[in-house]
């Protein structure tokens, strides 16, 4: 029996349950084990809690032998590799885009200036401000139902959350607008899961690898390489989206390319620096590093140092 560690929220157990069911369908008995993390116990702003707030307890459970593997939202994993663990599988990604849930079925452009929009993410807050719509950004914590209720109760005019989370909980009917990357670049690895186990557990790693999706792994690798190079940690205002696309060469042969778009935004929305590049899935990390280098050339370091030292970066 493969014991799979998961956070206790409905979203987390739904995500991990999908991994469990996929393993069972392939003939590998599996069960979920709920682990409480520091991020679940705290009601403070996510970025004040530190990197790894949702993952450390799950990793400890693996190391102590209480579980065999753990399912993380990939974007919650620290960008620095931990040699004790291996990401044995990155399953096929859900929709990586951000989504708006607004009162009266409105889209962002229809909300009047001064409308209250909730988000838990400095990245979303910065890009929302950069749209120049005059929206008032408010911090947002709690599970997805709690967040949605803040709109239905009239406490907020809208919230911006990951579309993937809404999809996994069957709440896509609440979405009033899906934000295209040209409006808002998602968080690196948004919509993707990471299935992690002990680095030396080659037998389990081989079983988990049956769930791996090569295109998703390439995309996530490029996005997280960009994030790591920017030394941003998971709460900095960095967006990135990569995808594997088919192209045709001069001889009419189809081949795969990996495209990557990245941005760094000032928290006040006054500036957004964007860069993009194209590479191959087999050199995903190199693509991430090259787009990060272009962002640095365009002034990302100066923009991010301002974000790091801003005492008011609570949302």
From Swiss-Prot:
Cofactor: dipyrromethane
Enzyme class, UniProt record, top EC level: transferase
Keywords: Porphyrin biosynthesis, Transferase
Stored PROSITE patterns: PORPHOBILINOGEN_DEAM
Modified residues (S-(dipyrrolylmethanemethyl)cysteine): 234
Domain of life: Bacteria
Cofactor note: Binds 1 dipyrromethane group covalently.
Pathway: Porphyrin-containing compound metabolism; protoporphyrin-IX biosynthesis; coproporphyrinogen-III from 5-aminolevulinate: step 2/4
GO cellular component, one term: cytoplasm
InterPro entries listed in its UniProt record: HemC, Porphobilin_deaminase_cofac_BS, Porphobilin_deaminase_N, Porphobilinogen_deaminase_C, Porphobilinogen_deaminase_C_sf
Catalytic reactions of this protein: 4 porphobilinogen + H2O = hydroxymethylbilane + 4 NH4(+)
Keyword NADP: no
Entry EC number(s): 2.5.1.61
GO terms for MF: hydroxymethylbilane synthase activity
GO biological process: protoporphyrinogen IX biosynthetic process
Pfam families linked: Porphobil_deam, Porphobil_deamC
UniProt keyword Nucleotide-binding present: no
Family as reported in the entry's similarity comment: Belongs to the HMBS family.
Additional remark text: The porphobilinogen subunits are added to the dipyrromethane group.
Annotated function: Tetrapolymerization of the monopyrrole PBG into the hydroxymethylbilane pre-uroporphyrinogen in several discrete steps.
PANTHER family membership: PORPHOBILINOGEN DEAMINASE
Subunit composition and interactions: Monomer.
NCBIfam families membership: hemC (TIGR00212)
Descriptive protein name: Porphobilinogen deaminase
Organism: Mycobacterium avium (strain 104)
């Amino acid at each position: 029996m493969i014991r799979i560690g998961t956070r206790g929220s409905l979203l987390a157990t739904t995500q991990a349950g999908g991994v469990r069911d996929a393993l069972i369908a392939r003939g590998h008995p599996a069960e979920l084990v709920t682990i409480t993390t520091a991020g679940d116990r705290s009601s403070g702003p996510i970025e004040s809690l530190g990197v790894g707030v949702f993952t450390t307890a799950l990793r400890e459970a693996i190391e102590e032998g209480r579980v065999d593997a753990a399912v993380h939202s990939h974007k919650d994993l620290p960008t620095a590799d931990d040699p004790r663990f291996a990401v044995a599988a990155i399953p096929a990604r859900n929709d990586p885009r951000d989504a708006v849930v607004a009162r009266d079925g409105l889209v962002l452009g229809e909300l009047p200036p001064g409308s209250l929009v909730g988000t838990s993410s400095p990245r979303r807050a910065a890009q929302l401000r950069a749209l120049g719509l005059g929206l008032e950004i408010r911090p947002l914590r709690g599970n997805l139902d709690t967040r949605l209720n803040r709109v239905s109760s009239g406490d907020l005019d809208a919230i911006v959350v990951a579309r993937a989370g809404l999809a996994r909980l069957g709440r896509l009917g609440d979405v009033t607008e899906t934000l295209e990357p040209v409006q808002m670049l998602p968080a690196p690895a948004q919509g993707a899961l990471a299935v992690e186990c002990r680095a030396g557990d080659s037998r389990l790693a081989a079983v988990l690898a049956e769930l791996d999706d090569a295109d998703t792994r390439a995309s996530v690798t490029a996005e997280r390489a960009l994030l790591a190079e920017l030394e941003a940690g998971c709460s900095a205002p960095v967006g990135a989206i990569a995808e594997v696309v088919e192209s045709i060469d001069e001889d009419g042969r189809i081949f795969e390319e990996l495209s990557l778009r990245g941005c760094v935004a000032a928290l006040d929305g006054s500036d957004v620096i964007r860069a993009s590049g194209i590479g191959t899935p087999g050199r995903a990390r190199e693509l991430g590093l090259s787009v990060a280098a272009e962002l640095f050339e365009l002034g990302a370091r100066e923009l991010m140092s301002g974000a790091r030292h801003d005492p008011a970066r609570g949302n």
